[in-house]
Design a protein with these regions (language model features):
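A structural signal for multi-pass alpha-helical bundles of membrane permease subunits
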Residues: 15-16, 22-45, 167-168, 173-206, ...
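Loop-to-helix transition at the N-terminal end of transmembrane alpha-helices
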Residues: 1, 20-21
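Membrane-topology segments of multi-pass transport proteins
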Residues: 1-14, 39-224
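Short alpha-helical segments and helix-capping/turn motifs at coil-helix boundaries
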Residues: 19-20, 67
Length: 462
């Protein structure tokens, strides 16, 4: 960037560079990261590197030996640690020390503990992290550390790491090896095959294309994926058709010369576009409330029905389309209002002389002349609604949920919200690798559909 703005030879690139840099930073970089994650097992159980996961396992310990009740006694600005053997009743006391950092305290047997009040549980809780770093050495040279808010116990490392990478459980004797195919330390059977037990946390490894076949072979993922894909396409197509139809008709009405108060109507019809969409969506969520919403109250009073907008798949999808049409028609109306100005009045005068009516004018003159320049914008609208995450997340959160799936999926989920739920709301853990694979497929699908639409449009109008 500095070279482009400092060198005269690259003067022309100064106007292109900000856009290219923004595209690289906000489009290409996230896309590359998403595709890279799709080829790994990155998930809530496999987030760490191999070295970090190994260190977490090596830091684990188990209780071995006696447990002692402990107390802290204030000694001016310092403290004394007292341990009591619950079996023999013997007391052990340390010298004065200050809390903070790793310390070894030599304890001596004593007949009586210091007089005065010992530290309350609140003080111990506040200093728990520092107390965990204390090692108390008893007269027999045995060492104990804090095991709970009331006790010090003898502890030993739970695992021992051999030079060949073999991990041994010191408590049970079970041996584990790193399985780089799944990203876990896993038990090894006598015949050298992998056992069933895995140690958590796991670590991130590359698994190649494994996430992509899961979308098509796992029954619990395959069924909702294809159903959600079909619904996503239907939703996007319906949204484009309805917003264009409503926007075009309203644009023709407010451009009607005989209509009085056209300016007021235009302002009122454009208002939904002026209100932030997330506010409108939340307002509609309240209006469609099944028990107290104004829409159901009105339908009940007029027709005696109360549709289950959020629990029935069909009515929930209808609600989604209705709300999205409300949010999208002002944009199409504004576009059509501008395009109508470009249609010569001579065409309508000539059709009037031939005896054509309003409907003939609309379908024979207005619609053909508007639809061609609108086509690229309709394709853009289709692509936008294909990934309309905000609408689904705020209005239905994907519900009502589908039953019998291994991933969280709902009847109103679009592919993008389905991907989000897999990544962040999975009941069996967050599966970022699978979500990234689905996101990659969505990218390819949207790109392919856009190319097909553009080619079909070009063939139609050439």
């Amino acid at each position: 960037g500095l070279y482009i703005f400092a060198n005269r030879k690259t003067y022309a690139w100064r106007y292109v560079y900000p856009g290219m840099a923004g595209m690289g930073l906000f489009v290409l970089f996230p896309l590359i990261c998403t595709i890279a994650i799709a080829f790994t097992n990155y998930s809530s159980t496999n987030q760490l590197t191999f070295e970090r996961a190994q260190q977490v396992l090596m830091d684990r310990s188990y209780q071995a030996g006696k447990s002692y009740n402990f107390s802290l006694f204030p000694a001016g600005d310092e403290w004394q640690l007292a341990l009591t053997d619950g079996e023999t009743g013997k007391n052990y006391l340390s010298d004065n020390f200050k809390i903070g950092g790793e310390q070894k305290l030599q304890l001596k047997e004593t007949e009586a503990l210091p007089s005065g009040e010992h530290a309350q549980l609140r003080v111990i809780t506040q200093n728990r992290q520092a107390l965990n770093q204390l090692t108390a050495v008893l007269p027999d040279e045995s060492k104990v550390t804090m095991s709970s808010l009331r006790q010090f116990s003898g502890t030993q490392p739970l695992y021992t790491l051999a030079d060949d990478g073999l991990l041994t459980n010191n408590q049970s004797g079970v041996k584990y090896r790193p399985n780089n195919d799944v990203g876990f330390y896993q038990t090894v059977n006598a015949d050298g095959s992998w056992g069933d037990e895995k140690l958590s946390p796991g670590y991130t490894v590359s698994i190649g294309w494994d996430n992509f076949p899961r979308v098509f072979t796992d029954e619990g993922i395959q069924k909702p994926f294809f159903a959600i894909f079909v619904w996503t396409v239907v939703f996007s197509v319906l949204t484009v058709i309805l917003t264009v139809a409503v926007g075009m008709v309203l644009a023709c009405l407010v451009q009607w010369e005989s209509l009085k108060g056209k300016a007021i109507y235009r302002v009122l019809l454009i208002l939904p576009y002026a209100v932030p969409s997330f506010i409108s969506i939340l307002i509609f969520k309240g209006l469609f409330n099944q028990s107290f919403g104004e829409i159901n109250m009105m339908l009940s009073a007029l027709f005696g029905i109360k549709p289950a907008w959020f629990s029935d798949p069909t009515t929930a999808r209808s609600m989604i389309v209705i709300v999205n049409t409300w949010l999208g028609y002002p944009y199409m109306m504004i576009l059509c209002m501008g395009l109508l100005k470009a249609i010569p009045d001579d065409l309508y005068e000539a059709s009037a002389m031939d005896g054509a009516g309003p409907f003939q004018n609309f379908f024979k003159i207005t619609f053909p002349l508007l639809i061609k320049p609108l086509t690229p914008l309709m394709i853009a609208s289709f692509a936008f609604n294909f990934n309309n995450f905000v609408l689904i997340q705020l209005l239905t959160n994907g519900g009502p949920d589908r039953l019998g799936t291994t991933t969280p999926a709902g009847y109103t989920d679009l592919l993008v919200s389905y991907t989000y739920r897999i990544a962040f709301e999975g009941g069996g853990g967050q599966d970022f690798g699978l979500a990234a694979a689905i996101a990659t497929l969505i990218f390819l699908l949207v790109g392919a559909l856009a190319i097909v639409n553009l080619k079909a449009t070009r063939m139609k109008f050439d």
